[in-house]
Amino acid sequence: MKSKVTLSAYCKVITFALIILLIIGIVSCRDNESKLWALVVISIALISFSLFYFPTSIETTNSSLIIHRFLKSKIIPYSFISSADTCIPSAGGLRLCGSGGFLGYWGYFNDIIIGTYFGYYGNRNQCILIKLKNGKQYVVSCEEPIQMISSINDHLSENL
């Protein structure tokens, strides 16, 4: 099963606004070459780094859960997964390192209910909590979270 990650309206606004601000900054610095190049380099680095983590879809295969990201996929074998269930990360959760809306939510977060996790999600209302046997946790999202959880749990029961 494969399901796309959709960005919430908040993420779309943050992404659009930040890109517009970067463009305005670059245009306004066109008379100062050193500032212009510094802002261009920072913009390229920010966007490239963000695209590396930006989640595009989630897929279950016979052997693993694949988190498709724009530039590189994250593969988690079912043998590493202990459980999958729905969750809603709190809006008051602490972002330790990552993005809180630009091209989705990605990075390390700490939530009072969930605990510390690495997030790859676009919409807080479509989240899945993936717990690994080693104690790590991932929060991912997709358009069909209930069906995705069912698919993951089916594969987990097959791999016991």
PLM region descriptions:
Residues 1-32, 132-137:
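N-terminal membrane-targeting/pre-transmembrane regions
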